[in-house]
């Protein structure tokens, strides 16, 4: 199945969380929280401005991003893969 986000939304595949602390301790349970990094797999056309123009998104397919999984985030399971649908404003940074 193919998903195409609308407007200023993006589709993100969450990267695996690090299961060891910086000191080498293996993290389990709530300490091993879900990663807030992921890879953009699809993007919408852009945000519609008040004057009707479309502002292209700052992220593109393949970008690794740090995101805030907040109020607007939607998790979907597609082809046995968990993906997030986020607004571009939920993306905090691009990892370069």
From Swiss-Prot:
* Record's keyword annotation contains Chaperone: yes
Q: Which GO terms describe its biological process?
A: chaperone cofactor-dependent protein refolding
Q: Where in the cell is it found?
A: Cytoplasm
- Cellular component GO terms, alphabetical: cytoplasm
Cite the entry's keywords alphabetically.
Answer: Chaperone, Cytoplasm
Checking Pfam families in the record gives:
Cpn10
Q: Which GO terms describe its molecular function?
A: ATP binding; metal ion binding; protein folding chaperone; protein-folding chaperone binding; unfolded protein binding
InterPro entries, per database record: Chaperonin_GroES, Chaperonin_GroES_sf, Chaprnonin_Cpn10_CS, GroES-like_sf
Q: Where is it predominantly found?
A: cytoplasm
Q: Which domain of life is it from?
A: Bacteria
Q: How does it assemble?
A: Heptamer of 7 subunits arranged in a ring. Interacts with the chaperonin GroEL.
Q: Which family does it belong to?
A: Belongs to the GroES chaperonin family.
Role of this protein: Together with the chaperonin GroEL, plays an essential role in assisting protein folding. The GroEL-GroES system forms a nano-cage that allows encapsulation of the non-native substrate proteins and provides a physical environment optimized to promote and accelerate protein folding. GroES binds to the apical surface of the GroEL ring, thereby capping the opening of the GroEL channel.
Q: What is this protein called?
A: Co-chaperonin GroES
| Native organism | Buchnera aphidicola subsp. Schizaphis graminum (strain Sg)
Q: Which gene encodes it?
A: groES
């Amino acid at each position: 199945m193919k998903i195409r986000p609308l407007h200023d939304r993006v589709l993100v595949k969450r990267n695996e969380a690090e299961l060891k602390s910086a000191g080498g301790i293996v993290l389990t349970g709530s300490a091993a929280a879900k990663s807030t990094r992921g890879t953009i797999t699809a993007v919408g056309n852009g945000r519609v401005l008040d004057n009707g123009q479309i502002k292209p998104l700052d992220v593109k397919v393949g970008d690794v991003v740090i995101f805030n999984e907040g109020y607007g985030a939607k998790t979907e399971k597609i082809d046995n893969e968990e993906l997030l649908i986020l607004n571009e404003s939920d993306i905090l940074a691009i990892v370069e």
